[in-house]
């Protein structure tokens, strides 16, 4: 008897489901974010990465493993240029011993229209802490265009 009641409730509850919105992805522009190589705007080398977005987003720029940064400060730096309504900054995720920890460079940002600027975010690894990998992101809090070039990871001794 309980099984019949359960099945009856399960079947009738799905009848009240209502689709609120469908996102058709027939065209990549519907996503609102484009990433492309820009050979005309660059800080060095042959090109930069140009990111244009209609809303806030986080872009993974890469992952690095095998870093020897125990008992050291890891610095994630990049040259960044913007034409933006909002701010953009670097974010680094350190994967250490099964956990994930982050550093957000919210004190070192680009906003509005800026020329090339080096921004950075640090992560401190104590003795015995070694990252399995590090994820390098760019966070855009707003809409507009951000160019990224010349990403550098460096380490400094802890003071």
Model segments located where?
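Bacterial N-terminal signal peptides
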Residues: 2-12
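Extracellular and organelle-lumenal recognition/adhesion modules and their flexible linkers in secreted
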Residues: 14-159
């Amino acid at each position: 008897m309980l099984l019949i009641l359960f099945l009856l409730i399960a079947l009738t509850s799905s009848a009240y489901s209502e689709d609120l919105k469908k996102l058709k992805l027939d065209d990549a522009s519907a996503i609102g974010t484009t990433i492309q190589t820009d050979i005309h705007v660059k800080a060095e080398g042959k090109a930069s990465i140009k990111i244009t977005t209609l809303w806030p987003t986080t872009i993974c720029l890469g992952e690095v493993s095998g870093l020897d940064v125990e008992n050291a400060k890891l610095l994630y730096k990049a040259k960044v240029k913007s034409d933006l309504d909002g701010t953009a900054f670097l974010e680094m995720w350190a994967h250490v011993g099964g956990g994930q920890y982050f550093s957000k460079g919210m004190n070192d940002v680009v906003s509005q229209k800026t020329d090339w600027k080096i921004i950075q975010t640090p992560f401190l690894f104590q003795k015995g802490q070694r990252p399995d990998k590090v994820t390098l992101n760019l966070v855009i809090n707003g809409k507009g265009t951000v160019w990224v070039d010349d990403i550098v990871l460096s380490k400094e001794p802890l003071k």
